[in-house]
Amino acid sequence: MCVICFVKALVHVFKIYLTANYSYNFRSWPVDFRWDDLHAPSTGNSSQRALTCAAAAAGVWLLHDAALGGDTLTRPPRGARSQVQCLLQQIRELPSQLASYALAHSLGRWLVYPGSMFLMTRALMPLLQQGQERLVDRYRGRRAKLVACDGNEIDTMFMDRRQHPGSHGRGLCLVICCEGNAGFYEMGCLSAPLEAGYSVLGWNHPGFGGSTGAPFPQHDANAMDVVVKYALHRLNFPPAHVVVYGWSIGGFTATWATMTYPELGALVLDATFDDLVPLALKVMPQSWKGLVVRTVREHFNLNVAEQLCCYPGPVLLLRRTQDDVVSTSNHIPSMPSCQVEGDVEGNRGNELLLRLLQHRYPSVMAREGRTVVTRWLRASNLAQETALYARYRVDDEWCLATLRSYRERCQKELDDAEAWGPHGLSFPWFVGQGLSARRRRQLALFLARRHLKNLEATHCSPLEPEDFQLPWRL
């Protein structure tokens, strides 16, 4: 054998070896990081805390019982009549509970998370392996196995740009990507921030690709928890330099992460909804309404809007104007070019924006503000947005000055430490009190335009790198 042929054969064998190293036989892969592997010294910051799963669950139930008015330590015994009524109620609810459980663990899980189906994973395996090869060869991706607090093994891929951050320093910022219900990091939403020059950390839901377990909300949250800890404590990114990007159903884990770790730098939600119930009722028979609502609330309670309002940092919502997946509208066009007025009215991202602005700026969003923002959300293209913006004569400079003046005034008047968070003055802001209705409309439109960006794209269209932007900061 000639020297050249030997070298070619050696390169071929080496490539086969590399492919085997990051193939989907992930069981024998050594554990790189566990949820309790926190080597950084404790500073009292929430990014440094190490709550066990048992302690976290206990805390949740303590709060739940307290909200119901019960004594969690010593609960007095109920009367015999009360116990009988409780038993009868449980017996009456047992059939519906069993039906809900059966639906959630069979058809329900496959509908909510189709990417966890074994047949889909097998069918996509060649594409997933090609995606892994591309990330490793072109972007020097580093694969790692993380273990969550429930024992699930989470498959991750990290692309580090810190050595060559680029002219804008984007590589110093880490984007944690949360995929959709049929998305994998090998061929998912991480391509946009990756091509835009950011450092990127992708991971697969439990039951997706190399990750073990089943993709129920609590398992997803546990997986997200270990991913964030891995980014902060092993990859050593400062919390302020970490951006969480969630696409579609990935908005649940993205908002959970920023709610649990409010010191994280920013949140970007792409084609995300506020609540799963309206979307589930859209695709299921009307006669199943009671069962569907109960199943979603008990087993797939993806309360994205509630979690979003708990995050005090910068937020950007990306709404796709041709999205028929997260829309409850009945007149979505069949062709992308057939845009008609009202196509975006049923997009659940509208409710997400309204909930966010109402929580953060309640005085601005009272009556006139909510009405004008709802009208602005009906605009399905840039021309309609601009026309409505000009109609109300929104003065961006005045809006910025008003918001900054309110913040500076609060800095002088408020001495309470609870009024300040990792991103400055905590929400809600009561700016807008005393302003005229016209000024409140202008301020509401200004805030809506800063928090939501329209994209003329369908739900599954890949996001262009130039469309991935960091949220607006005051």
From Swiss-Prot:
Keywords: Hydrolase, Lipid metabolism, Phospholipid metabolism. One of its GO terms (cellular component) is nucleoplasm. The active site is at S248 (charge relay system), D323 (charge relay system), H423 (charge relay system). It is an enzyme of class 3 (hydrolase). One of its GO terms (biological process) is lipid metabolic process. Gene3D superfamilies: alpha/beta hydrolase. Expressed in most tissues, with highest expression found in the testes, skeletal muscle, and brown adipose tissue. It catalyses: a 1,2-diacyl-sn-glycero-3-phospho-L-serine + H2O = a 2-acyl-sn-glycero-3-phospho-L-serine + a fatty acid + H(+); a 1-acylglycerol + H2O = glycerol + a fatty acid + H(+); 1-(9Z-octadecenoyl)-glycerol + H2O = glycerol + (9Z)-octadecenoate + H(+). SUPFAM superfamilies: alpha/beta-Hydrolases (SSF53474). Pfam families: Abhydrolase_1. Its EC number is 3.1.1.111. Residues 175-295 form the AB hydrolase-1 domain. One of its GO terms (molecular function) is hydrolase activity. Belongs to the AB hydrolase superfamily. ABHD16 family. PANTHER family: ALPHA/BETA HYDROLASE DOMAIN-CONTAINING PROTEIN (PTHR12277), PROTEIN ABHD16B (PTHR12277:SF37). Hydrolyzes the sn-1 position of glycerophospholipids with high specificity towards phosphatidylserine (PS), PS-PLA1 enzyme. Also hydrolyzes the acyl chain of glycerolipids with a preference for the monoacylglycerol (MAG) 1-acylglycerol, MAG lipase. Plays a regulatory role in cellular lipid homeostasis by modulating genes involved in neutral lipid degradation and in phospholipid synthesis and composition. This is ABHD16B. It comes from Mus musculus.
